[in-house]
Curated annotation (Swiss-Prot):
It is found in: Secreted. Its main location: secreted. This is Omega-lycotoxin-Am1e. It comes from Alopecosa marikovskyi. According to the nomenclature proposed by King and colleagues (2008), 'Gsp(267)' comes from the species name 'Geolycosa sp (strain A267TDLS2-KZARNA)'. This species has been reclassified since that study, as indicated in the work of Oparin and colleagues (2016).
Amino acid sequence: EDEVEETLPVAEEGREKSCITWRNSCVHNDKGCCFPWSCVCWSQTVSRNSSRKEKKCQCRLW
């Protein structure tokens, strides 16, 4: 029984890490985000010298 308790946090941590993934869109985010995480998108410039923007999305708890 003690062994099982020790391995649980590790499995949970791995699951959380796999949920925080980058994507180009939040459409159908249920396939890419794990509950209760939500998908957040924002625009950012590609580089300091460029005015071109790209959309970034990520799963987050906040």
